[in-house]
Amino acid sequence: MSDATPTVENTNIEQTNIQSNSHDMKLLKVISLLMDYPSHELFADDTLDVCKDLVKNSRLISPAVRGEIADLIDSLTNLGELEAQARYDSLFERGRTLSLWLFEHVHGESRDRGQAMVDLMAQYEQAGFAIDAKELPDYIPMYLEFLAYQAVATGDEMQVRMDIADVSHILAVLGARLIDKQSEYASLFKALLQVAGQPLSLIDDELANMNKSEAVKLAEDSLEAIDSEWEEEMVDFLGA
């Protein structure tokens, strides 16, 4: 795990800063924990079992997606801590395509990213949601933790769903890329789209775009190969 990757420290789903009896909002906490780096705490006690039970009882996601998240939890259990961490590193720590920092997908390394960070941090502070100074506020598991907190603190679950919908295009891209890698982590992004009331066809659209781009790249590579072969034949002919 790189030093740049924060972890959501509170792995106790039943105890948050503000108590909630809502399975709906606890689902965001579960997704946050499962999307975060699989630290030792995730495998301690009965955390994964509690996650599985909350997913099973969620009213916000479809039975199919519930089953896919259950499969992810089972795979974490079967892999164990070290192998789960190695798998996570191979997915999320190798380049930017699966970056879990929201603003990296929106602003890249431009100055706009810094201002967006400042604005989001101010939103956290105004809500009374404290994070460590070294942590970046746009880390998706952290953002989900904040939204779960907000839903309970304000009682405005609709606003939380709208906030998730605002980044649905990023979630769809990440979901599609994970499906392309045949990763069970894709289920978490499907779940977030459903919580936000967004269609899973957004992921299908991104997959179609990826396939189209890959087809174009293959065609371009083929043309380059043909041109190269033709040039070699011309050189051989002229040199004959």
Specify the residue positions occupied by each region the protein language model found.
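Charged, alpha-helix-forming regions
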Residues: 2-240
